[in-house]
A protein has these predicted regions:
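A short, conserved structural fragment
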Residues: 1-8
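Hydrophobic beta-strand residues in large extracellular and virion-surface proteins
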Residues: 3, 65, 109-111
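Short, flexible beta-strand-to-coil junctions
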Residues: 7, 69-70, 136-139
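Short gly/ser-rich loop at a beta-strand->alpha-helix junction or flexible surface loop bordering the NTP-binding
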Residues: 9, 24-106
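Minor-groove-contacting beta-hairpin "wing" of winged helix-turn-helix DNA-binding domains
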Residues: 9-15
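Generic structural motif
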Residues: 16, 68-70, 114
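Short, charged/polar, Gly/Pro-enriched secondary-structure boundary elements
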Residues: 17-24
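Hydrophobic alpha-helical interaction segments
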Residues: 87-205
Length: 205
């Protein structure tokens, strides 16, 4: 079959299907099953696609998902009725912190809308799309993962040759974070002098 159980609450997609052993948390797996039933275009992105490149996978985290813009209201209502806690991206930090305090942070899904499904397949984002989306969520919306963890993910992806850096920059331009991502991708070619120059320039502006 497509899916095999790895451990309690974690599922993986068989390598034979070309998904490179992607690990989904239980919430993401439930979301995938339900969205497949509904029949709308969608894809899961972020940490679920990249979890295998982490040393320590968090026990719980909000799932990042993209859904077709035209069907937002219908999907939103269906997910709420199914018991998912649907989060608007701009409220990520607050909703997660509130849930942590109340102990009710199960089945949290951050929903982004899109009309572009180019960088996804079978309801799952490509590695490059997942990284750009996770970077955006952390740096722009306060997603609960440290930049240090994201650096480790990037280092592992690079070391294993599992990320296409040109494609990553292209994908990043769709989220308007291409300058950030280009800096990350080209970081080892940038001298300390140039970094210092940039810091001074920022202070002067």
């Amino acid at each position: 079959g497509y899916i095999k159980r790895v451990r309690n609450g974690v599922f993986s997609f068989n390598d034979l299907k070309g998904r490179q052993g992607i690990i989904l948390c239980e919430t993401a797996q439930k979301l995938k099953n339900y969205m497949d039933e509904l029949g709308f275009y969608y894809y899961i992105s972020g940490l679920d696609i990249l979890a295998k490149y982490m040393l320590h996978i968090p026990e719980q985290y909000p799932v990042i998902a993209f859904i077709e813009k035209a069907a937002k209201e219908e999907i939103y209502n269906n997910l709420l009725a199914e018991g998912f806690e649907v989060i608007e991206p701009q409220y990520t930090k607050k909703m997660y912190e509130d849930a942590m305090l109340s102990g009710s942070h199960n089945m949290q899904v951050i929903l982004y809308t899109t009309e572009d499904f180019q960088y996804s397949s079978e309801g799952l984002a490509s590695i490059e799309k997942a990284f750009a989306d996770l970077y955006f969520a952390i740096t722009r919306n306060g997603y609960p993962l440290s930049l240090q963890e994201l650096v480790r993910i990037y280092q592992n992806l690079s070391r294993l040759g599992n990320i296409d850096k040109k494609k990553l920059i292209t994908v990043a331009s769709r989220r308007n974070i291409q300058y950030d991502i280009r800096f990350i991708v080209e970081n080892r070619f940038i001298t300390d002098s140039a970094i210092e120059f940039g810091k001074i320039l920022r202070r002067e502006e």
